[in-house]
Amino acid sequence: MSAISRRHAGLCWPRAHQRLLLRVLCGDADRASVALEKWQQAVDLARIDAGSLALMPLLHRRVSELGLRTPLAPLLKGAYRWRWCENQLLLRETLPVLARWTTEGVPVLALKGLALLRRYGNIGVRPLSDVDVLVPRSHAPALMRALPTAGWRARADDAPPPGRTDDRMAATHAAGFIRGRAEIDLHWASLAEDLSPGGDERLWQRSAAAPVTIPGTGGPGVSLRLPATVDLLLQVCVHGARWSRTSAITWVPDALVILREHGAAFDWPALVAEARARRLQVPLAETLRFLREELDAPVPAHVLAALDAEAPDWIYWSEYFARSAAPGRATTADRAAARLAQIVRAGGTLPAGFSEPS
């Protein structure tokens, strides 16, 4: 077990067989070929975890590009075709909603998969389980009321009690709405870790308008705001440091697509500055360290050194453990620290005696 594997044991990080898959997807040609053989011996495709399954379309493209032979080729091609159709259907259902919002004067910023699709160059290789968008906090209450009238039902755990929308918005960062097989995740804060009213100010300032289209339709698409590269990588990494019930590992190729697209031109000082401003050094440093040590990602060592958490750093480490551990494994103290970290980011002050753990 590598040092990084021991460091992440018991948390949300990719398991041994998932790391093999990631080496196929993200390593050089020679390493990819060896890793593919080992991965095929290690997994039973009939029982594969959801996180790995989501990357089968990307694996199809990778083995095709490298000319690798695998008995799984027909299944991988089928997974790619299925994902292509699913993503098409999702965008056809959701983009008209976003277009209506922009026509009504609501600024809409694409997050997560929707913001990353163009970087993959193919709508069929990157999974989209939903469409995540960010709107200004002031617009969110009206949109949360309007979506149900248009046939979108709130997820059971996201529906605020009547008249309690403000309470809902103060407690979390987003709400999901479903219609048929499509889902929109409406965000008023880009990250669950930072609910402060001004937390996304620089994200909005650095974003740029760009058309988001459905390939093959010939239409002009919908003009949305897209995050700057620095903000997109921060979102990908912080989200990747959270536990997920599906053992999601899509964040790894997402991050590497961004880093390899920009190479030496990537603005590392801006990324470090944003992480410090939002007190998110711990999850960013841990994910970047994983990418560097496991997959030889072009992450400079001085960047990791610059991401030391500021005092009281125990709060942010405890928050990291609370968010990256499976439910029931985080301690009460870790969960309390996660809430304290949100309070500090929102401009609050810690109670007396919280500068160091007791």
What does each model-identified segment do?
Residues S2-S129, V135-S358:
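Conserved NTP-donor binding/palm subdomain of two-metal-ion nucleotidyltransferases/polymerases, i.e.
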